[in-house]
């Protein structure tokens, strides 16, 4: 999953017929790659109405809704969900092997045979484990997204879709001289518009990401 687009191959393996229950906004039936210059665009577009039928090719979703649903699927399969808890460090056995985590809860230590660090690109757990020897900003990008409200009928008309059909557009260029690109996803009554920017050039340009999004929206 990337941002608000779900690619279902792994879900197909883990949760049969997940698409019958998941909180989906739209099923992606059109995917485009758009190359932008300062004043023009070249669009490579592919559309298949078959993608709007099971087992589907991709979907858009609101992450809070989808992530909550996915967590409940894990609970139903036997996982224990612990919310409102901050992981503060790692536990190690006498040989120095990682065998659990510490938390901000009283008596909140948890032991495990496997610990998976899911605390983001700046993972403090991975650093504590010694997996981040150094951090090079040139290996990182920054993603920023706006969500724009529009009536469903307007989205359907502008993107040439109907019912719960959706569109996924990936953009190369159009980021004000900063290495990177952008994206547009359609939800039922909103559009997600965002950019992904290389950190060194973004810092050198001394521009804020929201300024680059504003310039992208003004592209002719």
Language-model features: where?
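Residues that recognize and position ribonucleotide moieties
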Residues: 4, 26, 59, 80, ...
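Predominantly flavin-linked oxidoreductase catalytic cores and closely associated redox partners
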Residues: 64, 69, 73-220
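Generic secondary-structure boundary/loop-capping signal
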Residues: 2-3, 8, 30-31, 41, ...
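Short, mixed charged/polar active-site loops
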Residues: 39-43, 107-109
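Helix-loop-beta segment of a Rossmann-like dinucleotide-binding subdomain
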Residues: 41-63, 196-199
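Short, glycine/acidic-enriched capping/hinge loops at junctions between secondary-structure elements
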Residues: 1-2, 44-46, 127-128, 205-206
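N-terminal FAD cofactor-binding segment of flavoenzymes
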Residues: 1-39
């Amino acid at each position: 999953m990337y941002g608000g687009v779900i690619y279902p191959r792994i879900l197909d393996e883990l949760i049969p017929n997940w698409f019958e229950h998941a909180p989906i906004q739209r099923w992606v039936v059109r995917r485009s790659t758009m190359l932008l210059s300062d004043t023009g665009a070249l669009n490579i577009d592919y559309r298949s109405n078959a993608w709007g039928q099971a087992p589907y090719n991709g979907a858009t979703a609101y992450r809070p809704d989808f992530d909550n649903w996915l967590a409940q699927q894990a609970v139903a399969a036997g996982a224990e969900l612990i919310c409102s808890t901050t992981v503060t460090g790692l536990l190690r056995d006498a040989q120095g092997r990682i065998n659990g985590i510490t938390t901000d809860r009283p008596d909140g230590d948890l032991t495990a045979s496997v610990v998976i660090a899911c605390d983001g690109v700046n993972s403090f757990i991975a650093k504590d484990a010694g997996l981040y020897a150094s951090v090079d900003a040139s290996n990182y990008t920054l993603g920023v997204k706006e969500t724009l409200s529009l009536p469903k009928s307007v989205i359907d008309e502008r993107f040439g879709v109907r019912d719960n059909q959706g569109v996924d557009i990936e953009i190369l260029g159009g980021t004000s001289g900063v290495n990177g690109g952008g994206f547009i996803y359609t939800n039922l009554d909103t559009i997600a518009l965002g950019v992904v920017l290389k950190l060194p050039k973004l810092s050198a340009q001394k521009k804020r990401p929201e300024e680059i999004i504003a310039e992208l929206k003004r592209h002719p």
